[in-house]
Amino acid sequence: MTNKKSQTKPLQSSKQTNGKDLHTAQTGAQVLVEHIAARGVKHLYGVPGGDCSLDIIEAAEKMGISFILTRTENAAAMMACSEAELTGTLGAVLTTRGPGVANAANGVAYASLDRVPIVFISDGYDNNQASVSHQRFDQTAMLSPVIKGALRLDDVTALPAIDGLLDLAISGRPGPVYIEVTAQCMRNTILTGCLPVRIAPSTFGPPTVEALKLAHGLVLGSQRPILVVGLQCRDKNVTKALRAFAHKLQCPVFSTYKAKGVMPEADPQLSGYFINGAAEEETFRCADLIIMFGADPVEFPPTAFKYGSTKVLEFTNAQFDRCVYQPALSVAGDLALAAMHMCECVRPSSWHAEELRKIKTHMLTRATANEGGPITPQLLVETSCHLMPADTRCTVDAGVHMLSVIAHLQSKDPYDLLISRGLATMGIALPAAIGMAMADPQRHVVAFTGDGGLMMCTAELATAVELRCNITVVVFNDSAITMIGLKQKSRQFERVGMDYGHTDFAMVGQGFGCQSFRATTPAELEAALRNAFAREGPTLVDAVLDPTAYRHQMLSLRG
């Protein structure tokens, strides 16, 4: 096994090993499945091949793990990621070698940069097949930049290393690990008692007393701090402690996109979303301390940090190789403990309630996208939010439409919205919605996607239909990759390569058996959404909109 970050932790025996007959033999496939089942895996997503995949699927079904056949390997990884994010457990993906691995690479990169623990399983060749070239390349080498570790199971003697690799996926900064299996290992047997399932606890140590004292001093010495909360705060214990800290401090709170819901939208302290852009600049110029709490560098756009002259206090559960800002102090350790300690000593800042109200109003105004029509991006989001069932969760694809969704969707808790921010990949809203629906079938999921993103994963509508997922796909249909088109225009280039031909996604959805509706006017939009939300199973609303408002919105928010 090759690990990029080795960590030594005490081991705890899982209860699943109790009562095992030491003389019972299991195949390698059964052992592998047992070990991922012990991590809470309920679904195995993928597109199988004709070799070891079959052994693993058979073992999984017998152990209560359902194999979910997807249309693409990339989407399979995205579904596994969204289920893992929502449940806090390990996600699992299975593909064949060669093209299966290559096609899954984007989804694995998403797991890496968006900090999601998944295990990616694919088959390789047995050691006695050295002469074979068909579908052969160094799969581990290809995945190496985006995985935390890898393990090749070419013999049953390698099976004891599985737990260490799975521990690696969930420890520190979560991420993907890769297991390459062979027929020799998957089909041969080993005595059950030789391989008890052992799971190392995944916890962060407390921050040092010295670091907390220094942090107390920085906060007490500031009059107008601003709190920025990031993806590491989505753990329920961290969220609870962070909210208490924020309320004690009584300062503006800005969220990253992935942390949406950590502070409820209705909270008067939640001012808006930090993107190092133009909209929040006026507020940040008034701050004498920026507290980055649980923010990950992958969440920030690749632009120079605007506030280098303002002290930055960082709280993080893991140190980073690179970051857009240089903190005056970095406090590493358990974030819930850090927030509780800070809450004990801080006092309310000098920000007034009326200032907080004005900042919140200012940020919402800057996010307005109501120019043109008849259907504008803001109208589409606001109408969807007004009509969607209570407690609906959402996903949003990469693209300019996400600006309206982030600004106007009312989230109460972490994971009410899922977005790819680290990789910022297109084509994720639909697969992520399927994964969320599989993890929690009782809550409806809305996938907000542009037409470009949907065309990258359209076939997964068939997957949603077969699984009878309670999802609604809302399509921002403007027949273009609009965000890139706006950047092209800002550089005064001729418009080339930005426009798609017209697509009727309602007809496409119907072809897959998905109940689909089309809207070109506000009245049609309301009727389509009401129809979609009233039905069981997957639905789609194809909203033909005017993209005119995007240009002003982009300039207003980002500059």
Predicted regions and their residues:
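Glycine-rich, anion-gripping cofactor-binding loops and their flanking helix/strand elements
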Residues: 72, 85, 231-315, 412-442, ...
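Phosphate/pyrophosphate-binding active-site segments
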Residues: 2-23, 180-181, 192-194, 308-402, ...
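Thiamine diphosphate
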Residues: 129-134, 322-323, 332, 339, ...
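N-terminal cofactor/phosphate-binding cores enriched in small/glycine residues
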Residues: 25-109, 113-114
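Structural signature of the thiamine diphosphate
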Residues: 42, 85-95, 99-122, 145-195, ...
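Glycine-rich, acidic loop regions that bind phosphate or pyrophosphate groups
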Residues: 5, 121-162, 258-356, 488
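Cofactor-/ligand-binding subdomain signature composed of acidic, glycine-rich
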Residues: 2-39, 149, 157-223, 343-348, ...
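Active-site diphosphate/adenylate-binding microenvironment
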Residues: 29, 37-39, 49-60, 359-431, ...
